[in-house]
A protein has these predicted regions:
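Multi-pass membrane proteins that catalyze or facilitate reactions on polyprenyl-/lipid-phosphate substrates
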Residues: 1-263
Length: 263
């Protein structure tokens, strides 16, 4: 992988991590088109995800800081309750990561990966369409039950091609939660799992294996900058209820991808 390829992939990751169009699916398609070696996948993916975590913290810093301050209060408060809901939502993806991480990574190397990605993009399109046309009641706050269900949706999105943000946001909306609250919760709930994965890879000594540090840094920077822009954009899109356009895009991308595989 050269520096230009790293920058292009960083841009793809930064944009698609927050848009409900599957960052893993688009990243896999981009790698296939750019001819990036598959053995570089895990190392580079971890770096790009770490960049988007940082962009999330930057964009939502006021909320992150409010939660951190409230977390250390002696009295149980709304901030501590919110953090507990975030922790609850992270349990399913933690279990999936612990039990099936190797199988999921092996799936990325499979010759039929584009078929899987295509199918998951079509599923993402379906979920977003359901969320757009459903008219549930608007709950003031996300409940513990809803937090866990949204967490289950995030665990399902471990499948390549199934959009994490699309799945969690659609699930939250179908459960009757307010758009702005769901968007914020969706972006905050992924921070700890991705940070945890990044730290585990760093501890194993594999974080820079197989790819030059400068190339890795270029991809990280590109992903961070575009991630900041995409995060702000997506929050506004969810507030305005414009998810149907992403449903149409995912359907088109899934169909084109699967046709390109068989034709």
């Amino acid at each position: 992988m050269d520096t230009l390829q790293a920058i292009l992939l960083g841009i793809v990751q930064g944009i698609t991590e927050f848009l409900p169009v599957s960052s893993s699916g688009h990243l896999q398609i981009a790698k296939e088109l750019l001819g990036v070696e598959l053995e570089e996948n895990l190392t580079f993916d971890v770096a790009l995800h770490a960049a988007t975590v940082l962009s999330t913290i930057v964009v939502l810093w006021s909320e992150v800081w409010r939660l951190l301050k409230g977390l250390f209060s002696r009295r149980f408060n709304a901030e501590q309750a919110y953090v507990l809901k975030l922790v609850l939502s992270m349990i399913p993806i933690g279990v999936i990561g612990f039990l099936f991480k190797d199988r999921i990574n092996a799936m990325l190397d499979a010759p039929y990966i584009l078929v899987i990605v295509s199918a998951m993009l079509l599923l993402t399109a379906t979920l977003l369409a359901f969320a757009y046309y459903a008219k549930p009641r608007q709950k003031e706050t996300i409940s513990y039950r809803d937090a866990f269900i949204i967490g289950l949706a995030q665990a399902c999105a471990a499948m390549p091609g199934l959009s994490r943000s699309g799945t969690t946001i659609a699930t939250g909306l179908l459960l009757g939660n307010k758009k702005a609250a769901v968007a914020q919760f969706s972006f905050l709930m992924v921070l700890a799992p991705i940070l945890g994965e990044t730290l585990l890879e760093a501890a194993s000594g594999d974080l820079t294996a197989g790819i030059a540090t400068g190339t890795l840094a270029a991809g990280f920077a590109a992903s961070f900058v575009t991630g900041c822009l995409a995060c702000k954009f997506m929050i506004e899109i969810v507030k305005r209820g414009k998810l149907i356009w992403f449903s149409l895009y995912c359907a088109l991308a899934g169909l084109v991808s699967i046709l390109s595989y068989f034709c």
